[in-house]
Every structure is written in structure tokens, then in C-alpha cells.
């Protein structure tokens, strides 16, 4: 759906669908959990939901009453080992300032995908879901994403860090380039679901099961060490 603030009604853009089903969703329409716009190329937006694929659409090609081709993504991302999986779905997406796409999976990990060379020219067809076209890059692990819908985000003036909540109530911060965990903070007594960075200053807002929103800000330039119980907190995917 598209909402124009100048209009009193919403506009249907496309139907996100799949030809196969899984435990979470029967064949047909894909239930969506996350929609993000690429700020660098604002007519591209990515969606993720009840299957394993993050799909990228060009809003200029989206017309509800047009041909079926208008419902086809211009690109599709999925880790190779999850292609065809019936047990995972996407809970959160985020675009970096350089068009990298961050994808968080339920009962799995977080993956960073680069904008590949075929992004603009990939045919609008089922071939978009060919594993040969899917390029996995960095992987971020240690958090637990099972109980609720977890968001994911970037942090830093140049998106140097990756953020995620966890079922253990902690906020995880990894250095993007090395995929190395650098901060682990208690953000909720139960679960941390969402994290949002201020666009201009190093402030971070988080929320979870508790009835409040927490605002975080750095107190100094020194990076504190990880807590002594870090090994007890980290979740290892089996």
C-alpha cells in the first residue's frame, strides 16, 4: 500500500507473492514484516516477511492494474544455505547509506548483502530467485531472534556498526566491516525488539517488552570491554 499525504485514501501498489509455501504461510501472498526505502536510490524499496527472500521493488514499475510483471521484484536476496528453507522468515530489514541491505531472520542470523552489479538490470521474472544470483556477504551472530519480531539497523555517521535486539534482553552492536561484536548492553528485562538511530547525532532509541523507550548516548570516547558473562549471553545457532 502507498499513502500519499495529499490524498484521503491509500493506493495499492503490488501483491508480494510466492509460488511455494512453508510452515508460516501457504502458497500465494507473502505476509510482510518489514518495508525499507533505499535513501540513496529512493525509488527502490525492499520488503521481507513470511518466507526466506528479501525482495527489492522499483516503485516506478508498481501498478496494481498493470501486467503481472509489475509485481515482480527487480532483485532478490537470500543466503545460499537458506534458499528453499521452510523454517525461516524475515523479521527485519535495513538499508545503509551505500545501499547495503541488512536482513534479520527468525531462528537464524543477520546477513549483509551488497548492491551487486546486476541490481539494475536483473530481469523481472522468476529467475530473480535463482541462487546463482544471490550474493551473501557478512554474517552477524550471537543474538537470539525467536520469540518476537526483531528489527535490525545500522549505527554511526557512516553506518560503521550493525545493531540488533535479542530474546535475552540485550542490545548487540557489531562492527560492520569485521562482523565483530563490540558492545553488549542490557536493554530490557525480557526482550529487545526495535532499535532506531538518530540521523545526525550518536543517540540510539530502543524498546522491547517493557512499557518504555530507552535513549542511549555515549559517555566517553573509550570503548568499554564486553561484560564478563558474555559467553553465557551469546546464543550459538545449532
Task: Kindly give the residue locations of the regions a language model identified.
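Terminal intrinsically disordered, low-complexity extensions flanking WD-repeat/beta-propeller proteins
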Residues: 17-22, 61-102, 106-111, 115-161, ...
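Solenoidal tandem-repeat scaffolds enriched in leucines and small polar residues
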Residues: 1-70
Amino acid at each position: 500500500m502507498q499513502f500519499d499525504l495529499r490524498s484521503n485514501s491509500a493506493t495499492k501498489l503490488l501483491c508480494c507473492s510466492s509460488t511455494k509455501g512453508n510452515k508460516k504461510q501457504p502458497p500465494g501472498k507473502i505476509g510482510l514484516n518489514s518495508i525499507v526505502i533505499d535513501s540513496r536510490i529512493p525509488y527502490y524499496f525492499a520488503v521481507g516477511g513470511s518466507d526466506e527472500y528479501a525482495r527489492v521493488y522499483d516503485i516506478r514499475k508498481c501498478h496494481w492494474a498493470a501486467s503481472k510483471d509489475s509485481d515482480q521484484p527487480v532483485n532478490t536476496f537470500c543466503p545460499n544455505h537458506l534458499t528453499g528453507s521452510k523454517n525461516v522468515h524475515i523479521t527485519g530489514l535495513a538499508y545503509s547509506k551505500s545501499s547495503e541491505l541488512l536482513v534479520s531472520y527468525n531462528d537464524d542470523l543477520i546477513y549483509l548483502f551488497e548492491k551487486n552489479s546486476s541490481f539494475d538490470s536483473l530481469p523481472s521474472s522468476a529467475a530473480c530467485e535463482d541462487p546463482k544470483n544471490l550474493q551473501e556477504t557478512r554474517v552477524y551472530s550471537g543474538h537470539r531472534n525467536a520469540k518476537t519480531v526483531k528489527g535490525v539497523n545500522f549505527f554511526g555517521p557512516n553506518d560503521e556498526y550493525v545493531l540488533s535486539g535479542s530474546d535475552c534482553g540485550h542490545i548487540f552492536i557489531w562492527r560492520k566491516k569485521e562482523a565483530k561484536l563490540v558492545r553488549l548492553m542490557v536493554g530490557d528485562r525480557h526482550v529487545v525488539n526495535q532499535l532506531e538511530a538518530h540521523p545526525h547525532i550518536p543517540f540510539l532509541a530502543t524498546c522491547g517488552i517493557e512499557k518504555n523507550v530507552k535513549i542511549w548516548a555515549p559517555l566517553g570516547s573509550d570503548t568499554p570491554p564486553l561484560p564478563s558473562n558474555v559467553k553465557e549471553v551469546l546464543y550459538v545457532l545449532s
